[in-house]
Amino acid sequence: MRLLNKFLIQVGSKYRPEELLNVNNKRFTETVDVSLPRDMMVYNGLYLGQDKRWFTPSSLLLQKLAQEDATKKAYVERDAAWLFVVGKDIFEENVQRFQGDVKLGSYCLVMFGEGCIGYGRFETSGDRRVIKNMFDVGDFLRRE
């Protein structure tokens, strides 16, 4: 719960899930009432993400956060979006516009059109400013 809340604060979200359930190796979900015993559950509700060394959000959570106006966002064009989805970082000059208070060291959602394709940390790399890829939707494809 602590890592999830920290992530939500970092991206500027006002969303705070109320009922959380820890099932299957620290995967958080918004719970749904079911009559199964807890030890027999595999999933229950909307998958929000997983605790590792930091919180790794699900693509469903990222899409939910993308609908909020307060969330920090960086909008990119098609070529930069493709590079981000295959695991590359985005240079600041490839960002069309920022929404919200995106400063060096802060986290933001990376948007292509109205869809969120991941999130990253806005930082410097050498003499350039980049959005370092922390998670993208291509992660699921690379795992297979």
Label every PLM stretch briefly.
Residues 1-144:
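Polybasic, low-complexity RNA-engagement segments
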